[in-house]
Amino acid sequence: MPGWFKKVWYGLASLLSFSSFLLIIVALSLPHWLSGKILCQTGVDLVNATDPELVKFIGDIYYGLFRGCKVRQCGLGGRQSQFTIFPHLVKELNAGLHVTILLLLFLALALALVSMGFAILNIIQVPYRAVNGPGGICLWNVLAGGVVALAIGSFMAAVKFHDLTERIANFQERLFQFVVVEEQYEESFWICVASASAHAANLVVVAISQIPLPEIKTKMEEATVTPEDILY
């Protein structure tokens, strides 16, 4: 059985892995990966709007990996509309990249559970195989954190290099053309960053668990011999 010191740190490692699992689920379910401001370029061109009047033509948009919301501002007041990524909108995006992001996050969910299982195994017993010990915990956390980081990088690539927000904003728009004037990552994106950070923290936790504790030595009581002992 492992000592109490290692049990405490392995317990913390299992909690971090489980928290990463929960964070990914939250990030997948919330439609707040990115928000932005969209300008109705068609409306601006029609009325030849000047800078002070541009506010009337700037709407809002936010979205996640499955759904989102758009507020159109084309000079006649805001019109809000909800949209879903699947099954039609994804065809207008880089479908392969979007599906890859989802697959990576689902894989990260599985890897987070595996890393938690390995941490619990090391709490219960000392594995006889090195790959099941601290090295195994580190391996699965590196894989899980790396997969989450790859999903984050893929989403950033979709936003920056594949005009993700602009494609979503102009989906099924026949009369108006929208231009993205501002973008910022929202809580779901940063929740994924926190998930990857949890796995990185696990590497530190496992390293700390391997620090040998100083042995507490008790002084043996010196034997005293009395004259009575000699007589017997």
From Swiss-Prot:
InterPro entries found in the cross-reference section: Clarin
In terms of one coarse class, where is the protein primarily found? Answer: membrane
The cellular location(s) given in this protein's UniProt record come to:
Cell projection, Stereocilium membrane
Parts of the chain that traverse the membrane? 8-28, 101-121, 139-159, 188-208
* Domain of life according to the entry: Eukaryota
Summed up, the tissue specificity of this protein is: Detected in inner ear, particularly in hair bundles of auditory hair cells and is enriched in apical stereocilia. Detected in eye, but not in brain or muscle.
Which cellular component appears as one GO term in the record?
Answer: stereocilium bundle
Q: Its membrane topology, per UniProt?
A: Multi-pass membrane protein
Keyword line: Cell membrane, Cell projection, Hearing, Membrane, Transmembrane, Transmembrane helix
Q: Does the keyword NAD apply?
A: no
Describe the outcome of a gene knockout: Mice homozygous for an ENU-induced allele exhibit an early-onset, progressive hearing loss, with a lack of fast-graded voltage responses. These mice harbor an early truncating nonsense variant (Trp4Ter). By postnatal days 6 (P6), mutants do not exhibit any gross patterning defects, or differences in the overall number of outer hair cells (OHC) and inner hair cells (IHC) bundles compared to controls.
Does the keyword Membrane belong to this entry?
A: yes
Which BP terms in the Gene Ontology apply to this protein? auditory receptor cell stereocilium organization; inner ear auditory receptor cell differentiation; sensory perception of sound; stereocilium maintenance
Name the family.
Answer: Belongs to the clarin family.
Q: What does this protein do?
A: Plays a key role to hearing function. Required for normal organization and maintenance of the stereocilia bundle and for mechano-electrical transduction.
What is this protein's record name? Clarin-2
- UniProt gene name: Clrn2
